[in-house]
UniProtKB/Swiss-Prot annotation:
Organism of derivation: Sphaeropteris cooperi (Australian tree fern)
Record's protein name: Light-independent protochlorophyllide reductase subunit B
Biological pathway: Porphyrin-containing compound metabolism; chlorophyll biosynthesis (light-independent)
Family annotation (Pfam families): Oxidored_nitro (PF00148)
Keywords assigned: 4Fe-4S, ATP-binding, Chlorophyll biosynthesis, Chloroplast, Iron, Iron-sulfur, Metal-binding, Nucleotide-binding, Oxidoreductase, Photosynthesis, Plastid
EC supergroup of this enzyme: oxidoreductase
Gene for this chain: chlB
Cofactor note: Binds 1 [4Fe-4S] cluster per heterodimer. The cluster is bound at the heterodimer interface by residues from both subunits.
Cross-referenced SUPFAM superfamilies: Helical backbone' metal receptor
Top-level taxonomic group: Eukaryota
Amino acid sequence: KRSLRDLGIPVNQIIPEGGSLKDLKDLPRAWFNIVPYREVGLMTATFLEKEYGMPYVSVTPMGILDTAEFISQVEKLVNAWASVLSEERVNYMLYIQNQTRFV
């Protein structure tokens, strides 16, 4: 959550953390999904991609390399939406460098 907040990406839902059945109706509002634990959420993410065209990132952001890969994949998805919405593209490389510089 912290990394997404640092990157200026609002979080729609965190399932199952504090989620309820009532909250599930808002899932299709997300631009993309994050599946940090494939064994728990991959089937749901695959369903949402198939039914609603919502892509997902399934890299667990643990360790330097996987965190960098996670942020790179998020960047690609955000930039895909930026081109659709005619908004400015983002570049998270500096964020990745700052997060991994002293590790």
